[in-house]
C-alpha cells in the first residue's frame, strides 16, 4: 500500500484534486487495516486516554474562574518541559478520541468559567475539542502555542495539522497564536495572524547536584539526537574524536553511531535508549561540555538544561538564545557541519568554562524577567 502511495505521489501534483482523493482513500484503508489488526491495543489505548481525560476534568476544578488554563501532552517531553517552564495553570491531557471525552472537557471548561484555553501544540482530538468549546461558548478565548518551525512542514502529518489549525483561525475558532522563535512570530504577525512571542525557559532548582568524578578524560555529551538527520550526530562524534583525551557520552546511541565510534576508535560511555529527564540531568553534570549543533531548530530546552547543571553547551546558530552577547560568542556555532571548527570551539569552551557559566548566570536573570513579561502579554490579550 505504501509503494502504491509513493508511485501515485510521483505522477500526481501534490495538493491537487486527484491527489487529495487518493490520499483520502489511502488514509481510510490504512486506518481500517490498523483498527482491524490492532483492535485490542486500540481499546486499551482509548481506555487510558479516557482515564487521562477524567483526571484533567478533576484538575480543571482547581482553576474555577481562572483567566486561563494550558493543556499539554505530558508524553511529548520537549513540549511538556516548555509548558511547565512558562505557565502555572497547566493541565496534562493526551490524545482525545472519544466524543464523550471531548464533551467532558468542553463541559468542564464552561462550568468552571475559565476565560481562556491555551493548547500547547495540538494532539489528536484537540481540533474537535477547540471547535466544541467555541460552539458552546464563543466568548472563551482559544489560543495555540506552535512549538515547531517551517522545517517540520516537510512532514505530511505536521503540514496537514498546520492547515487545519490555520483554517480554524480564519473561521474564528482560534483567537491567537504564540511562537517560541522570533522569526516564526515575526512572519505570522506580518502575514496577518494575531501572534505573540514566547521564549522557552527552565527552572531546575529541584534537580540534585552531584559531585563530579575526578578523571583525566574530557567527557563530552551528545543527547536526544538519535537518528534524526537535523541533529547532526556524526559531525559531533567526528569533532569529539579530534579533541585530545576525550570521551563521548551519547544517549541514546543508535546502531549507526555506535558503528561509527568503533571505526573512529572513539571511547564512549553510552546508552542505547532514552532515559528519564531527571536521570539525564544528573548524568550530564560529569561532562566538560555538551554539544547541540543542530542544522535547524526552534527553541530547544536542552541547552538551557545543560547550563543550569553547570555545563556549557555549544549550539547551532538557529534559535534566539544568547544572540548578541559575549556568552553567544563563546557558544553559538556558525559552521555546524565542520568537525575541525567544532573541535576548536569545544576546546575553547572547556578552557573558558568558568567564565562561560558566570556569563550564563548573569544572562539568565534578565532572561527570566523577559519570559515572564512575554507570558503575561500572551495570557491577558
Residue ranges and their predicted role:
Residues 336-343, 348-381:
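A charged, aromatic-enriched C-terminal amphipathic alpha-helix characteristic of glycosyltransferases
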Residues 4-139:
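N-terminal pre-catalytic "stem/leader" segment of glycosyltransferase-like enzymes
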Residues 312-318:
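Short hydrophobic beta-strand element within catalytic cores of glycosyltransferases
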Residues 294-295:
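Aromatic "clamp/platform" in nucleotide-sugar-dependent glycosyltransferases that forms part
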Residues 209-231, 237-243, 249:
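Conserved donor-binding/catalytic core segment of Leloir-type glycosyltransferases
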Residues 157-195:
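A short, active-site helix/loop in glycosyltransferases that binds the activated sugar's phosphate group
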Residues 172, 258-281:
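Nucleotide-activated donor-binding/catalytic signature segment of Leloir-type glycosyltransferases, i.e.
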Residues 98, 150, 197-209, 255, ...:
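Short beta-strand->alpha-helix junction loop in the catalytic core
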